[in-house]
Amino acid sequence: MEHYEVLEQIGKGSFGSALLVRHKHEKKLYVLKKIRLARQTGRTRRSAHQEMELISKIRNPFIVEYKDSWVEKGCYVCIVIGYCKGGDMAEAIKKANGVEFSEEKLCKWLVQLLMALEYLHASHILHRDVKCSNIFLTKDQDIRLGDFGLAKILTSDDLASSVVGTPSYMCPELLADIPYGSKSDIWSLGCCMYEMTALKPAFKAFDMQGLINRINRSIVAPLPAQYSTAFRSLVKSMLRKNPELRPSASDLLRQPLLQPYVQKVLLKLSFREHDTLPSESERRSSYPQQRKRTSGKSVSFGPSRFGVDQEDSVSSVKPVHTYLHRHRPVDLSANDTSRVVVRRPAVSSVVSNSSKYVPVRSNQPKSGGLLKPAVVTRRASLPISQKPAKGTKDSLYHPNIGILHQLNSPDVSVNSPRIDRIKFPLASYEEMPFIPVVRKKKGSSRGSYSPPPEPPLDCSITKDKFTLEPERETKSDLSDQNATAGASSRASSGASRRQRFDPSSYRQRAEALEGLLEFSARLLIDERYDELNVLLKPFGPGKVSPRETAIWLSKSFKESSPSNLEED
């Protein structure tokens, strides 16, 4: 700390603060992030140390620059990173004041963000908190992706499953209790690009239940018509509900629309490094070969496309410009009707990539029979088949991660609220959340994945912002699901739907406020300050959410989940 001069505080969060500092010898500005360790749980302290270790190993031109880190008197984890004079993307959207960004600028930003995510996913790292406030801009309006407090390092047999992140940027598979991989970051990036294009959030609702319903149905308004059809289709492809159909960062970088911007970025990087790009032979020797993708062949996403000789440590990952031009463009049209088969490995088998899904596309079925999809892997708490799908090959995913292999990856943020500790009702039984149903086919001992039918967009109508119209059920819907689970879900969701909050009723306001105080007191006694911060945040000055909504939401928490305050 003696090498830095503190200038001012530029940010403050639940777990620490951000200070603008100047290096005494370099005379250069940096940001000092101080994460408080005192009065924190063991998981939070481990997460702070993990963020310090992780960001010190990451080197990418579009990720915040790492300068230094240390532990101060055992009370703070201090991380020094590069200062971005342009602020964050959320501020840039507000300053735009309704004037849309040009398509050229958006494509440039998208390419830089995709290069950053490609680098992370190739190193088996999930960011898990990609949002506009974590995307920073330099004075030259270049992108720097930051805030790795929720990042997770995937091992060979691991997928992320904890509900962490910012709710409006969460992907459907995360909300549907399905293990997720790198495609969750692509969804979050799609939400960011939508917000940067339309200057408004992709998913917004008055309460958490409404937000979950919108995400589960992937309901978004059309993008402004001033942008090209190719660009709008690109953004829409990142918001596909099914992660199997969502493109990876590599797929998006190979799109013809983005190729000119990729070339510009590579040219700029080559001048910045005062060196020319390596020859094709040098590039092939410096980075593992990728498998060619052809129609009817196996398609895998993320790091599984690298050869088995790849070393998986972050320090071994080469610059992104060495492997972006090896494949033909991938069609991202929503009209792709190719058959998709999901390989399901055994529980103890090696997962082939950081993403959960490895689809196999085939234009022509095999002679003698039709292809049947295997069961989608769910969490360990849900029933799964122990038998691997027939024909599943050994994975190319390498288990060791070099230096990062020694790091644990607790599912807790050091600078974001613990969403997985807040118990809110998920989509009800009638609303058909994005949960696959396992059915048994006659004459076959293997389960198959049959996605539920897409519900109509107008099946739920909001009477006002406090009361939702229950949806009608059909007998065919009930026949496809477990009757016991459906009855319990309908009972809980129906009870909450029948409640109506009248802001003019002093009695109801008093009861709701009493419930809010009781709930806050219980959180305070249990020292769960992150959830308490989320609960009381709408009462601060200048907040958009009305107080009645916050009071009613806290009352719903109390009534719908009275025993949800136990520690994980």
Curated annotation (Swiss-Prot):
Region spans: Disordered: 277-312, 440-505
Composition bias type Low complexity, residue spans: 483-496
Function (record text): May be involved in plant development processes.
Biased composition (Basic and acidic residues): 461-478
Family statement: Belongs to the protein kinase superfamily. NEK Ser/Thr protein kinase family. NIMA subfamily.
Name of the protein described by the UniProt record: Serine/threonine-protein kinase Nek3
Organism expressing this protein natively: Arabidopsis thaliana (Mouse-ear cress)
UniProt cross-references to InterPro entries, sorted A to Z: Kinase-like_dom_sf, NEK_Ser/Thr_kinase, Prot_kinase_dom, Protein_kinase_ATP_BS, Ser/Thr_kinase_AS
Residue intervals of the Protein kinase domain: 4-258
Active site: residue positions: 129
Catalysed reactions, as listed in the record: L-seryl-[protein] + ATP = O-phospho-L-seryl-[protein] + ADP + H(+); L-threonyl-[protein] + ATP = O-phospho-L-threonyl-[protein] + ADP + H(+)
Keywords: ATP-binding, Kinase, Nucleotide-binding, Serine/threonine-protein kinase, Transferase
